[in-house]
Amino acid sequence: GATLTQSALYALLDRVRLHETIYKQAGAVHGCALATNEGDTSQILMFVEDVGRHNAVDAIAGRMWLDRLDGADKIFYTTGRLTSEMVIKAAQMGIPFLVSRSGLTQMGFEIAQKVGITMIGRATNKHYLLFTGGARFRSAI
């Protein structure tokens, strides 16, 4: 299966910062991104902000369906917590890598382990916590 490198994760986090426009101006919104996973880099394919974190996820899921995008080589980023619902939605989209700047719930953790999603939380700048799927993550060390 696919692997995610620390360099690609850092590239994603750098690019997400450039996209959070409503959040920078007003706050109180969640952002979600669908990104490529290309070796040592990552490009954002789509970015959605909404007051409801589920709305932002669903907008990306819908766009993936309309554009017939395969999730197997993608990374999903959310500003929201890694809940069971977020993990299930990522699994339904076929995305193996789930990244958030927030934390996780116990149920989200358990489901991610069960379905084989690599889940990374508290991801900001050069800091992150790898919660599940460590075998598919390559750090720079």
Please state what every model-predicted region is.
Residues 28-29, 72:
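A generic structural signal for well-ordered coil/turn residues at beta-strand boundaries
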Residues 48-52:
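Short beta->alpha transition motifs characteristic of CBS
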Residues 41, 140-141:
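Short, low-complexity, intrinsically disordered N-terminal peptides in bacterial proteins
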Residues 30-37, 121, 129:
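Short beta-strand scaffold segments in enzyme catalytic cores
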Residues 1-28, 35-47:
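Intrinsically disordered, low-complexity regions enriched in acidic/Ser/Thr/Pro/Gln residues
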Residues 53-131, 136-139:
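Feature captures the catalytic cores and cofactor-binding loops of soluble hydro-lyases/lyases
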